[in-house]
Amino acid sequence: MTNPSPHFFKTFEWPSKAAGLELQNEIEQFYYREAQLLDHRAYEAWFALLDKDIHYFMPLRTNRMIREGELEYSGDQDLAHFDETHETMYGRIRKVTSDVGWAENPPSRTRHLVSNVIVKETATPDTFEVNSAFILYRNRLERQVDIFAGERRDVLRRADNNLGFSIAKRTILLDASTLLSNNLSMFF
């Protein structure tokens, strides 16, 4: 197993100063609208928010002793729950919106909650590193319930779309090391 990229296991670095209220509000509103798109199964509209160079990544998490903390998450070159590009995300969207994607037929009912949004401006104009906490509730069929909690580390760019931003990178760090869900057909 290769060593993971340092940003997977280190605490998100707080910006030296808080983002301005207007920028903070814009980004939080972006996340609320993004959650609404996903919860209303508007997957094609959500897909339009992804940059062409998107990297959508959810590493595996394992239980480690304190001295092995840097190995808690799988690395860039290791197995992952998701390691997606724009093209593979498009394939996932096509699958969940078709009649042949059995994992989502009938479709799940989801609720995305996003909070603790921390915005960090970068040296690149109109590009922001954003850390947020999430809870994703999913109900499927009659009794299947899944609850996922964790944090997302995103790179957002200002964009000429109706929400004002696009997602250039998303790293999803789940709090759980063992997933009891039947599948991971939803989007975080």
Curated annotation (Swiss-Prot):
The SS bond pairs are none
| Keywords on record | Aromatic hydrocarbons catabolism, Dioxygenase, NAD, Oxidoreductase
Q: Name one GO biological process term.
A: 3-phenylpropionate catabolic process
Pfam assignment, any one: Ring_hydroxyl_B
Source superkingdom = Bacteria
Task: Please give the Gene Ontology molecular function terms for this protein.
Answer: biphenyl 2,3-dioxygenase activity
Identify the NCBIfam families for this entry: PRK10069.1 (NF007479)
Summarizing the function annotation, the protein's role is: The beta subunit may be responsible for the substrate specificity of the enzyme.
Q: What does the annotation say about its assembly with partners? A: Heterohexamer consisting of three BphA subunits and three BphE subunits. A ferredoxin (BphF) and a ferredoxin reductase (BphG) must be present to obtain activity.
Q: What is this protein called?
A: Biphenyl dioxygenase subunit beta
Organism (species): Paraburkholderia xenovorans (strain LB400)
Instruction: Point out the gene that encodes the protein.
Output: bphE
